[in-house]
């Protein structure tokens, strides 16, 4: 299912790692809070407030992971869908980041049907400092499953003309 590498494998199968994906060191600390989460037919948007609660100035890389409902197709425990970085925040200062991504970025590929499929159900949007350090979450519901059919890249889309061999 997954190669034995990367946060998707390690998180899905509960393997411990020395440094989780997205891990970074800082001389300060940050607090996260979801301000707003919304999803329309095409786009997802999450507003997150990041506040420097430490004693020195610093920047923070904010990561957004999505946990999809079990729609019958294999999925990792969570997948990175968006990220952003704050400006240099002084102690006590905060900034709101707006993270956006396409709704179909949350879909799974169905090899049998050659289609991207967005399962119906609850999607957990996890705001994190790394793949192992989730700070806050929001939940959005997909009320109707969606499929986006694609074609086989190796299959000719129109019949290929057959040319007779030429003798030289």
Task: List the model feature ranges, each with a label.
Residues 43-45, 94-98, 135:
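Intrinsic-disorder/low-complexity, polar/charged segments enriched in Ser/Thr/Lys/Arg/Asp/Glu/Gln
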Residues 57-64, 76, 109-112, 136:
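Short, hydrophobic/aromatic beta-strand segments
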Residues 72-111:
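Intrinsically disordered, low-complexity Pro/Gly/Ser/Thr-rich segments with frequent PxxP/GP/PP motifs
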């Amino acid at each position: 299912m997954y190669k034995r590498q990367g946060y998707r494998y390690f998180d899905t199968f509960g393997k411990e790692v020395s440094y989780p994906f997205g891990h970074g060191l800082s001389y300060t600390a940050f607090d996260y809070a979801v301000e707003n989460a919304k999803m329309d037919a095409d786009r997802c948007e999450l507003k997150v407030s990041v506040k420097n609660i430490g004693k020195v100035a610093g920047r923070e890389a904010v990561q957004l992971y999505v946990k999809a409902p079990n729609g019958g197709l294999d999925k990792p425990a969570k997948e990175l869908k968006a990220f952003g970085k704050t400006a240099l925040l002084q102690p006590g200062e905060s900034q709101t980041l707006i993270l956006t991504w396409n709704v179909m970025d949350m879909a799974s590929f169905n090899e049998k049907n050659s289609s991207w499929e967005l399962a119906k159900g609850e999607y957990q949007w996890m705001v994190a400092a790394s793949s192992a350090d989730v700070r806050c979450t929001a939940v959005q519901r997909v009320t109707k499953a969606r499929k986006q059919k694609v074609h086989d890249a190796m299959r000719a889309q129109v019949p290929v003309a057959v040319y007779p061999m030429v003798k030289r």
